Amino acid sequence: MTGLAARASSARPVVPLDLPENGFDLIGEVKLASPADGQLVTVDDPGRRVQELALLYEDADVAVISVLTEPSRFLGNLDHLEATAVAVEVPVMRKDFLVDPIQVIEARAAGASGVLLIARLTEASLLAEMTDTAIGFGMFVLVEIFDQTDLDRISVVFDREILIGVNTRDLTTLKVQPGRLADLAPHLPDHLPGVAESGVKSPDDAEAAARLGYRLALVGTALVTSEAPGETTRRLIAAGRRAISKRSAS
């Protein structure tokens, strides 16, 4: 633990998450596989492909790059995170099934500027501890929820500067339930940016999320499997920002 904490403290500096007050941005996700869709990328050098995707996302002006580090279902690892953090200048977030503050410190040691924490994986007290661990290193935290019960549970961290992600994928069936974004949007704290997760595949999806008040969308499969990931990223961001402009003008 002492050595890991020392590595985290001496790692590449955290890249601050800088979001405009009333805008729409994308978290571009790098992953090689998913439980819902199987293997997404077949290449001889997965690490290199991870870096290539990250650079395309960065060039398309994403706010954050999310990197899967879970090995069995997503074919990820911490090396992918570290390689991405070295290659880009935007914040990089570790996405995994994190259940211990040590894993947050691991992420920082590998160069992450943020972490995703799944609300229902831990008790509220542990979620708060992991959140505070990340914030203590200057990292941002995206707390992921699936329903109102999850939202109630994470009220212990509403006084921290976190992002709240609403995942529309049903964990049992793995099917996307887009209506969940609309159901939960009115209940999200006004002072915390909301993130639409899973199911944002088209400009129409991005526009719909933005109209509901979500400040970001986390998009993975639609970008990874696109023939032109950078251009797809740009279209999604532009659609969300158009929706914001229309809402502001009305």
Model-derived features with residue positions:
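C-terminal active-site rim and adjoining tail of enzyme catalytic domains
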Residues: S198-V200, A210, V219
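As written
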Residues: A112, R211-Y214
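Conserved N-terminal beta1-alpha1 strand-loop-helix module at the mouth
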Residues: M1-V92, V99-I102, T133-L163, L171-P178, ...
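Residue-level signal for inorganic ion chemistry
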Residues: A107, I164, G220
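Alpha-helical hinge/cap motifs
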Residues: K95-D96, G111
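A short alpha/beta connector and helix-capping loop motif
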Residues: Q103-T122, L127, T133
